[in-house]
Swiss-Prot record:
Sorted UniProt keywords: NAD, Oxidoreductase
Matches recorded under PROSITE patterns: GLFV_DEHYDROGENASE
Active site annotation, chain numbering: K102
Protein name, UniProt field: Glutamate dehydrogenase B
Signal peptide (UniProt feature, chain positions): none
Domain of life of the organism encoding this protein: Eukaryota
Keyword Nucleus attributed: no
Protein's GO biological process: glutamate catabolic process
Single GO molecular function: glutamate dehydrogenase (NADP+) activity
Gene3D superfamilies: Leucine Dehydrogenase, chain A, domain 1, NAD(P)-binding Rossmann-like Domain
GO cellular component: mitochondrion
InterPro entries according to UniProt: Aminoacid_DH-like_N_sf (IPR046346), Glu/Leu/Phe/Val/Trp_DH (IPR006095), Glu/Leu/Phe/Val/Trp_DH_C (IPR006096), Glu/Leu/Phe/Val/Trp_DH_dimer (IPR006097), Glu/Leu/Phe/Val_DH_AS (IPR033524), Glu_DH (IPR014362), NAD(P)-bd_dom_sf (IPR036291), NAD_bind_Glu_DH (IPR033922)
Length: 411
């Protein structure tokens, strides 16, 4: 089941639990706006290249739309649509005043020079500048993009609208970025895991973790979990997978990855088949890579007692059912990985106020939001007698439905 079908399925299940009528259901499901633009740029060799860019603006009932821009050769309109919808529910679960959006350009960043990436970003911004804005739609980095990409968008947008640092988040600190933003999603995963384990009478200390994906989110989560006494027993990334049942030295691994661009060849652990990473013996599994990696083919072999979804849509609905029967507790993506968008909200607030928070305040506020979010999800689970995924979906959908109704949009 693809990401859009799975997201729609979860929405429909939540809608039924909430008793929403069909008219309101359709209002919530259909995107506010879908944008498709053609971006033609001169390449460094003088030739012209054309790329297709997308931006799906899903919902703005609770505030400006919010979501990343990804640069990837397989940017798919259906996936962008699904991720935009997920952002709507995610921001509602986090209880921050945003709706959902997502965008991307079908390109391979590694095949483009820095100057070509800059030209592409600026042309894309020129095409959509009148459809985004501080109080309209606020982009952020995603797969294949970074703070420099956001700096180019900010600069190009400002040519049309005046200096507007709050138009994007995930910016460099020197242009109004927030302290703590780089670690935010990974730190949010730590706080989410802490809340889940605490609810089951456990703590991070002494638990064995497996982390699939060692990019920004996975590496920060692993580092912070280790600092809290957790043991990382296996890690994987695009280069390979490693395992050490006694615990991997994450500080040494981070140094190795920086020098070698991947976990492959790390001497402090044994090399294993990357396809086996999800079924390694552990207490907590953290998928922090791509979507759809936990499916009906491997779900039956998963040994973890808890799954904390750091990636977007890592678990197929068929796998959900198999894991539920095994008693595996899944903390869903729309709560577990909301730390990034929450600190993006803090960045936006700081930009609008023209006042910078220190990192301690950012992290303290993030922990408070994550703890409140977990309590709110659990309350919905009790109300509707459902699992954590449906608890999160009913929480998010209900908040958006109430805002939609109050604004008179469902009529």
């Amino acid at each position: 089941m693809n990401a859009l079908a799975a997201t729609n399925r979860n929405f429909k299940l939540a809608s039924r639990l909430l008793g929403l009528d069909s008219k309101l259901e359709q209002c919530l499901l259909i995107p506010f706006r879908e944008i498709k633009v053609e971006c033609t740029i001169p390449k460094d060799d003088g030739s012209l290249a054309t790329f297709i860019g997308f931006r799906v603006q899903h919902d703005n009932a609770r505030g400006p739309m919010k979501g990343g821009i990804r640069y990837h050769p397989e940017v798919d309109p259906d996936e962008v649509n699904a991720l935009a919808q997920l952002m709507t529910w995610k921001t509602a679960v986090a209880n921050i005043p945003y709706g959902g959006a997502k965008g991307g350009i079908g390109c391979s960043p590694s095949d483009l020079s820095i100057s070509e990436l800059e030209r592409l970003t600026r042309v894309f911004t020129q095409k959509i500048h009148d459809l985004i804005g501080v109080h309209t739609d606020v982009p952020a980095p995603d797969m294949g993009t970074n703070p420099q990409t956001m700096a180019w968008i900010l600069d190009e947008y400002s040519k049309f609208h005046g200096y507007s640092p709050a138009v994007v988040t995930g910016k460099p600190i020197d242009l109004g970025g927030s302290l703590g933003r780089d670690a935010a999603t990974g730190r949010g995963v730590l706080f989410a895991a802490e809340a889940l384990l605490r609810d089951h009478g456990k703590s991070i200390a002494g638990q064995r973790f497996v982390v699939q994906g060692f990019g920004n989110v996975g590496s920060w989560a692993a580092q912070l979990i280790t600092e809290q006494g957790g043991k990382i027993v296996a890690v994987s990334d695009i280069t390979g997978a490693i395992k050490n049942k006694n615990g991997i030295d994450i500080a040494s691994l981070l140094k190795h990855v920086k020098e070698n661009r991947g976990v492959k060849g790390f001497h402090g652990a044994d090399s294993i088949d990357p396809n086996s990473i999800l079924v390694e013996d552990c207490d907590v599994l953290i998928p922090a890579a791509l979507g759809g990696v936990i499916n009906r083919d491997n779900a039956k072999d998963i040994k973890a007692k808890f799954i904390v979804e750091a990636a977007n849509h890592p678990t197929d609905p068929e796998a959900d059912e198999i894991l539920a029967k095994k008693g595996v507790v899944i903390l869903p993506d729309i709560y577990a990985n909301s730390g990034g968008v929450t600190v993006s909200y803090f960045e936006w607030v700081q930009n609008i106020q023209g006042f910078m928070w220190d990192e301690e305040r950012v992290n303290t506020e993030l922990k408070a939001y994550m703890n409140r979010g977990f309590k709110d999800v659990k309350d919905m689970c009790k109300t509707h007698n459902c699992d954590l995924r449906m608890g999160a979906f009913t929480l998010g959908v209900n908040r958006v439905a109430r805002a939609t109704t109050l604004r008179g949009w469902e009529a």
